[in-house]
């Protein structure tokens, strides 16, 4: 009997295939007394080594298929396996209490997971998820249990799961896995982001697919509208095959725009750029018609290693990106470490709330040797392309002035050394803290440009952790408060003749695009795979026709009102 299940559209496309339930066995742990504690510690170490080997393989597969930025999460998992704060208490428990490795691991991991989950911030939630994923793998080795391996799937299927861990998602073979659907998760969960990178249709947050779908049943995953159809009729299958064909035709039409400029129906030009993490990501930017790089996340250069990258290593990476972009603008964000990104070799003290703590520009202004090394590398690379530099997490005008002063000092030093440096480097800032948006008029007199980081701006403005399912309903890109802040920033910048970009998820969202175009956003930076769809949409919109509706939109009192109005007025969905 056909059943329709509603979820969240996480990755566009239509998948029609038999269900494959990805079920991991219950890992039952019993407490046992042991006398040979050294042998038990050796068992633990062997399981840790096996897990490391597996994760290294998964990391390399993810790097090859998805790029360095998506593989970075497995660096975090490998760090968990080597973290003495986790591993030493497990060994101590085995030695001091004469208990088996499984019990010691389970007890210590549960303690850390509960501790991190009780703390109300995104970084700690992700830390708990990392520990859960990693310790489950180690526990399976200790128990001699085989955990499901998605990479072994050898027929066309739709995966059904309660959730997909990052390691599960990275192992999906796109040849056979046509789509997936999960009980939990949202558009910003790791599995959803990776699905979009891999272009695998996905519907998440359904709550009931594991309960409602058995192995082998035909399933349709509609990643366009967020629906899952179980055991569809022949007529329904034909209808969705037609929908899939229409979507494929639409994608083919978008592909024709790869070398076109992004111009609205009334001839207003905007720039569509891409967010990248490594030089390898440039290929995807160019293949999808990106007009620039709107966000180069430099922190990936610093991760998965035992010490800071040298000036020469950084110079080589920046130079490569600038050369490959062949004169198109490249906006580089200086080091944004802290919050959800740790560098163990810096030995920074633990913080109760790292997202509001010692991170990004705050860290760089104090650890100036590290900051100056990065700036020197960027300045040296500037002659190889169109470089723009921006500072993250700026809260006060004085912070921006300090950061820019250090940049100018390093520029002067290089020139004294006879090193050529571009004279056309624009220097801007991220707007991701509400205070920055509120005084954007003051910042606009200092900066060359703004880039609005909506992912953090939304969280900080609405005090809502987007990874916390209990409050994720408050993560609202179209909330009137967010739209008004964006409007304030754009108006303040344009008054001073400065340009404004946006590099959060919102920039590529089909509901946000008409509003942002009307407000006058100059640059939209998104995942490379979203560029052509966004270009097609903008070419059909008239900025002049949108502008009369802006006061109405900005005066609405809820997200729901905004979405309904935009959909009906601009014919979306």
UniProtKB/Swiss-Prot annotation:
The positions annotated for binding phosphoenolpyruvate are 297, 333, 455-456, 466
Q: Which residues bind Mg(2+)?
A: 432, 456
Name the active site residues.
190 (tele-phosphohistidine intermediate), 503 (proton donor)
A Pfam family annotated for this chain is PEP-utilizers
What cofactor is needed?
Mg(2+)
Question: Which family does the UniProt entry place this protein in?
Answer: Belongs to the PEP-utilizing enzyme family.
Subunit structure, briefly? Homodimer.
Q: Under what name is this protein listed?
A: Phosphoenolpyruvate-protein phosphotransferase
Q: Which organism is it from?
A: Priestia megaterium (Bacillus megaterium)
| Classification of source organism | Bacteria, Bacillati, Bacillota, Bacilli, Bacillales
